Amino acid sequence: MAAVAAEQKKVVVHFRSTGNAPQLKQSKFKIGGNEKFLKIIDFLRRQIHQDTVFLYVNSAFSPNPDELIIDLYNNFGIDGQLVVNYASSMAWG
């Protein structure tokens, strides 16, 4: 039953550029909670037209690409959204 709820739940992902990374015209997107973090990585690579991108949740850590977005949101979501910082080069350890 929890898998069904995760499948139907959309998560608002708020992208924030860091350093010299290009800013997005639209910074908030909805994505299915059952998707893996890899989908966010691939999506952002296409949006900013760069092969190398470093992503961090809440400016703190870089999640494993296999993590489910709903799990990240449930544990680290703030104000109804998952904040993902991105950079062209490594920004945080």
From Swiss-Prot:
InterPro entries found in the cross-reference section: Atg12, Ubiquitin-like_domsf
Pfam families with a match to the protein in the record: APG12
Keyword Metal-binding: no
Cross-link position per record: Glycyl lysine isopeptide (Gly-Lys) (interchain with K-138 in ATG5): G93
Secretion signal span: none
One of the record's GO cellular component terms: autophagosome membrane
GO biological processes: autophagosome assembly; autophagosome maturation; autophagy of mitochondrion; glycophagy; piecemeal microautophagy of the nucleus; protein transport
UniProt keyword annotations, A-Z: Autophagy, Cytoplasm, Isopeptide bond, Protein transport, Transport, Ubl conjugation pathway
Subcellular location: Cytoplasm
Origin superkingdom: Eukaryota
Gene3D superfamilies assigned: Phosphatidylinositol 3-kinase Catalytic Subunit, Chain A, domain 1
Any one Gene Ontology molecular-function term assigned to this protein's record: Atg8-family ligase activity
Chief location bin: cytoplasm
Annotated function: Ubiquitin-like protein involved in cytoplasm to vacuole transport (Cvt) and autophagy vesicles formation. Conjugation with ATG5 through a ubiquitin-like conjugating system is essential for its function. ATG12/ATG5 conjugate has an essential role in plant nutrient recycling.
Family: Belongs to the ATG12 family.
Cross-referenced PANTHER family: AUTOPHAGY PROTEIN 12 (PTHR13385), UBIQUITIN-LIKE PROTEIN ATG12 (PTHR13385:SF3)
Protein name: Ubiquitin-like protein ATG12
